[in-house]
């Protein structure tokens, strides 16, 4: 059974620096589990790790999808599994790093992403309803038949809301019911799972500062370039935090100051949702960064914990 290390946590908590230091000590390579860093050309708004920051550590699943393409959890799982096989075949250690909980869970939980249940016509009808009556209407519709999915998903998660409705229409069962007979932790990996966290107010301050740095580093110009390349707000990639707000500014819907505040607010709310998601997995070891002097102490703690297992 292959060993994999997972370093997760909310946005701006400092996963990148710590994971690279760990990779250097473990002869490891990093697999990004980030739903925005997967896209090409979207560097500043996704806080994508730079070549200099990588410090010679090979990174996988960064800059592999064109922003015009839809990218699913199933696609991530397949690509990440291939990367794990590649890394281990070269006697190196796979390190999964990111904050997209569903991406991480696709690897460390026994989820079915085969897409066996499909009804294209019904799916298209739901998309038409969403366009006519709004995303919130479909989200409320989900409440009556799949309360678990309703609580997990937000109205803006339209693709997954429609998927939950589609599965119920075909099978008469919710996604949770279909997975209830499956051993959730029956996976082909031996996992070492660590979640970085810190005082909430400190985290929010780091998030606000990161957004300010993104603006100084040219976020507006990056979005202008993407728009000029033909990418628009209807695309999955351009609905990411930081991109949709700047697009609204460029379209004259809001001021730049309003866009910046929306990015900060959206990022803080996203961090809160990430923490809620990660708390669901009892296998994870939480690392409170506030009690350590520096990142090197955290790296030592994680490496020591792995050796003890």
From Swiss-Prot:
Keywords: ATP-binding, Magnesium, Nucleotide-binding, Transferase, tRNA processing. The record marks 100, 123 as: Interaction with substrate tRNA. Its cofactor is Mg(2+). The keyword Transferase applies. The keyword Nucleotidyltransferase does not apply. SUPFAM superfamilies: P-loop containing nucleoside triphosphate hydrolases (SSF52540). It catalyses: adenosine(37) in tRNA + dimethylallyl diphosphate = N(6)-dimethylallyladenosine(37) in tRNA + diphosphate. ATP binds at residues 9-16. Its EC number is 2.5.1.75. It comes from the Bacteria. Residues 34-37 are annotated as: Interaction with substrate tRNA. One of its GO terms (molecular function) is ATP binding. GO terms for biological process: tRNA modification. Substrate binds at residues 11-16. Monomer. Catalyzes the transfer of a dimethylallyl group onto the adenine at position 37 in tRNAs that read codons beginning with uridine, leading to the formation of N6-(dimethylallyl)adenosine (i(6)A). Belongs to the IPP transferase family. NCBIfam families: miaA. PANTHER family: TRNA DIMETHYLALLYLTRANSFERASE. This is tRNA dimethylallyltransferase. It comes from Clostridium acetobutylicum (strain ATCC 824 / DSM 792 / JCM 1419 / IAM 19013 / LMG 5710 / NBRC 13948 / NRRL B-527 / VKM B-1787 / 2291 / W). The lineage of its organism: Bacteria, Bacillati, Bacillota, Clostridia, Eubacteriales. The gene is miaA.
């Amino acid at each position: 059974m292959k060993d994999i290390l997972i370093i997760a946590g909310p946005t701006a908590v400092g996963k990148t620096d710590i994971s690279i230091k760990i990779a250097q000590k473990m002869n490891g390579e990093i697999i990004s589990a980030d739903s925005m860093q997967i896209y090409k050309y979207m560097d500043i708004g996704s806080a994508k790790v730079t070549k200099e920051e990588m410090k010679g550590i090979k990174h996988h699943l960064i800059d592999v999808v064109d922003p015009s393409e839809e990218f699913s959890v199933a696609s991530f799982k397949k690509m990440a599994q291939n990367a794990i096989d590649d890394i281990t075949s070269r006697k190196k250690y796979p390190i999964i790093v990111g904050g997209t909980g569903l991406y991480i869970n696709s690897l460390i939980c026994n989820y079915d992403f085969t897409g066996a249940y499909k009804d294209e016509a019904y799916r298209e009808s739901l998309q038409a309803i969403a366009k006519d009556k709004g995303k919130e209407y479909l989200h409320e519709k989900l409440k009556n038949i799949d309360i678990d999915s309703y609580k997990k998903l937000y109205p803006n998660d339209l693709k997954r809301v429609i998927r939950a409705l589609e599965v119920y229409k075909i099978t008469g069962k919710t996604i949770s019911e279909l997975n209830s007979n499956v051993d959730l932790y029956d996976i082909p990996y031996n996992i070492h799972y660590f979640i970085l966290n810190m005082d909430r107010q400190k985290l929010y301050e780091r998030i606000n500062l990161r957004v300010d740095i993104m603006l100084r580093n040219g976020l507006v110009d990056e979005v202008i370039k993407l728009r000029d390349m033909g990418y628009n707000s209807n695309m999955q990639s351009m609905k990411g935090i930081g991109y949709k707000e700047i697009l609204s500014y460029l379209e004259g819907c809001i001021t730049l100051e309003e866009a910046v505040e929306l990015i900060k607010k959206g990022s803080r709310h996203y961090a809160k949702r990430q923490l809620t998601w990660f708390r669901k997995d009892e296998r994870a070891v939480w690392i409170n960064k506030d009690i350590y002097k520096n990142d090197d102490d955290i790296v030592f703690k994680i490496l020591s914990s792995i050796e003890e297992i």
